[in-house]
Amino acid sequence: MKTSIMSYVAASALALAAFRSAAGLLDNAWIKGTTDKDPLTYRAGEEIAITLTPMDIDGEVPAGEYALELTRSDDYGNFKTWTEPFTGAPHVYRTSLDKPGFVRLEAYVLGPDGKRVTKKFTGDATTPEGKKAMNAFEKAKKAVFFDGGAGVEVEKLAPYAEPKDFDAFWTRQFARLDKVPVAFLEKVEVPQRNPRTRLYAVSIACAEGIRPVTGYLSIPVAADEGKKFPARLETHGYSGNPGFHMPGGWARETEIVLNINAHGMKLPAFGATDDDLEELRQSIKSNGRSYAFDPVQNADPETAYFNGMVLRVKRALQCLKTLKEWNGKDLYANGGSQGGLQTIWAAGCGEGVTRADSAITWCCDMHSHADRLAKKASSGGWYIPWTEAMGYYDAVNWAKRIPTACRTNITRAGLGDYCCPPMGLAKLWNSIPGSNKSIVWVQGSEHGYVPPQYEGRDFKKGIGK
């Protein structure tokens, strides 16, 4: 999730293409993982068979030189690591789990030196295409690995109890917005590449004491002729060291788009300087911790960093609904990781979102993260320390309040993503009311990595399955 983590997925795909001219034994290689049935349908105590198939090895693997490092873990703190010979042939691992939850299997190829193999870029970096491929390769994970697993009786997974005054708390918070009229504080047209749209840098008034909503608003030129359009809110992933929010190339002539940052930062179009950016970076930290991670700040739901973020999301939707160019019916929200969390907030905050597309949703059932850390069933540092106040921001609790009229899509849930663990995503899915929803579980997918497409990778549940 750190700095442009969502771009790693695209980088991985580009890097794979770059490997095709590789000469090294494993510079093209990756490991495909498949289960003997739909990985979300195992029952307690049932054997789970995961087949690991090495792909795109360039030659024969020398006998006795390489090993496969395997780690089996689960949501309950069970953990085991061992090695087996790596021959390039498929490997079947069998396990089970006696209660609802997920089993995780990690596999890394070790080289003759006993260290994890690191793939090397072997393309031609002297051409523009080659340089682009090399840059993508540098951003991608370079190990030869698999990270995935399977779920057991996932339909039984239920979240930690929500705060008893959840709705009353948010009624009070939203009343703070009601005291401040929806209005642009600043709106400046900025250059962009699509002549059929206009793009504006905007600052929108938020609640008193809260930084404004800032970002970029694109409106189709055809609106000048009286045409009306759907409106979309786009939100961002996490960056503990944010850079300037710059205009992107996403302006579309088919819909209105408001692309906002998490912080209400000053934009370059409004004269933002390096000093302004550094001031923001320092101000969003708390007690030496990156924003939103300070348990002292998070002890009170009103002082939690997420409080202002939620209010900015709701105000952004309110602003979209005031635009004369909006068609008055289609209101969308989308984002990934932290943006996926904000998308769930958007869908559940009462502004009438009609479609929400949330990928690799962060902060689902955060209480279980505390258990995971205590049992050392964790990898990565992306679990916010639990306080009871975090229950007011947990994606699972917001999901319960999504109207059934809203089409809610969890567009990617990685079975190897332990930044946003599968257990939390399953609880999110179970908490969304009704049947107007879908989720795509992706085998072998980490937070910033999706393996190449193969049969047995994707499993869609809900509408359109």
Predicted regions and their residues:
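Hydrolase active-site cap/lid region
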Residues: 269-273, 336, 340-388, 441, ...
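C-terminal catalytic histidine-bearing segment of alpha/beta-hydrolase fold enzymes
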Residues: 366, 419, 423-465
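Cap/lid segment of the alpha/beta-hydrolase catalytic domain
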Residues: 242-311, 367-375
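Alpha/beta-hydrolase fold nucleophile elbow
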Residues: 325-336
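N-terminal cap/lid segment of alpha/beta-hydrolase-fold proteins
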Residues: 34-40, 177-227
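Short beta-strand elements
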Residues: 86-88, 114-159
